[in-house]
Design a protein with these regions (language model features):
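Conserved alpha/beta-domain cores
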Residues: 2-282
Length: 282
């Protein structure tokens, strides 16, 4: 397993100190491509330095090889955020909450040619910048072998064409359902890091429509789910970040930090407020 986002000087004890947790938390700008053709998707917020970017390209449509379109998307981000670490996610093939058979990696495994194209583009990007891969909607430990086979086929193709790449890049999972939280230890045995997505957990645990915020009782349930995910990751020695509305909730930051959140995956417009809140906590 590859180490991911770990501090340069680990604490001597097994339990991380509060100071270490605060020092190691990372802010990640999320760019999930939902933009019209010709519009630049990458607009860094003013006054914030971005060290890590999470990128989800649009599903490929029309003419052009999917691999080249993914690679062009990632390469542009690398040029805009020169020196930043890139966390690359494949696009959803069918982001419909009611159709679990086509969500995340399940849908991508059914469209293996597209999934392999993503892996090839991601590994090619690793020759240009420090890179990680983040897989969406992984909730079943038995999916790991099929995902690995898909990645291995992509690597063999790159080797055949003598493309440069880093084969050791970390691969993580996005935890989006209560089931994934409950079987977190089995899932994390196969992956290098995790990101708990509060928006998806709200949708599946509380049946909330997209964009609707939970009641205080529902919010407490979500905090317990994300904290369980963080604690499981800590026991397994894995990095765990938080995405969704909880990551941008400045009032929740002290509690997330206390439970060992290693990173906050945020829309770019939320970065200034969260940066200010973190500075006050420190």
């Amino acid at each position: 397993m590859q180490q991911f986002f770990l501090p340069a000087e680990p604490a001597a004890s097994k339990e991380p100190t509060e100071q270490l947790r605060r020092a190691s938390i990372r802010q990640v700008a999320e760019y999930n491509a939902r933009f019209a053709g010709g519009t630049r998707p990458f607009r860094p917020p003013r006054g914030c330095r971005i060290d890590t970017v999470c990128l989800t390209p649009p599903p490929p449509t029309g003419a052009g090889a999917p691999e080249e379109r993914f690679f062009a998307f990632f390469r542009e981000a690398r040029e805009v955020f020169d020196g930043a670490e890139l966390i690359l996610s494949p696009p959803e093939t069918a982001p419909v909450r009611t159709d679990f058979s086509r969500r995340g990696v399940r849908g991508l495994l059914r469209e293996s040619a597209l999934f392999e194209a993503f892996f090839r583009a991601a590994y090619r990007t690793s020759a240009l910048a420090r890179t990680s891969i983040l897989l969406p909607f992984v909730s079943d430990p038995t999916e790991a072998d099929a995902i690995r086979r898909c990645a291995e086929r992509a690597l063999r193709t790159l080797l055949y064409h003598r493309e440069p790449f880093d084969e050791t890049i970390p691969i993580g999972i996005r935890v989006e359902t209560p089931a994934a939280v409950l079987c977190g230890r089995q899932l994390l045995e196969d992956w290098d890091f995790a990101v708990a997505d509060a928006d998806s957990l709200a949708a599946f645990a509380l049946a909330l429509p997209q964009g609707e915020r939970p009641t205080p009782c529902g919010a407490e349930i979500l905090r317990e789910l994300t904290e369980k995910c963080l604690e499981t990751a800590h026991v397994c020695g894995r990095f765990c970040g938080i995405a969704g509305f909880l990551a941008a909730d400045t009032s929740a930051l002290p509690r997330l930090i206390a439970h060992g959140a290693g990173g906050l995956f945020l829309p770019p417009e939320a970065l200034p407020a969260v940066s200010g809140a973190l500075a006050k906590i420190r």
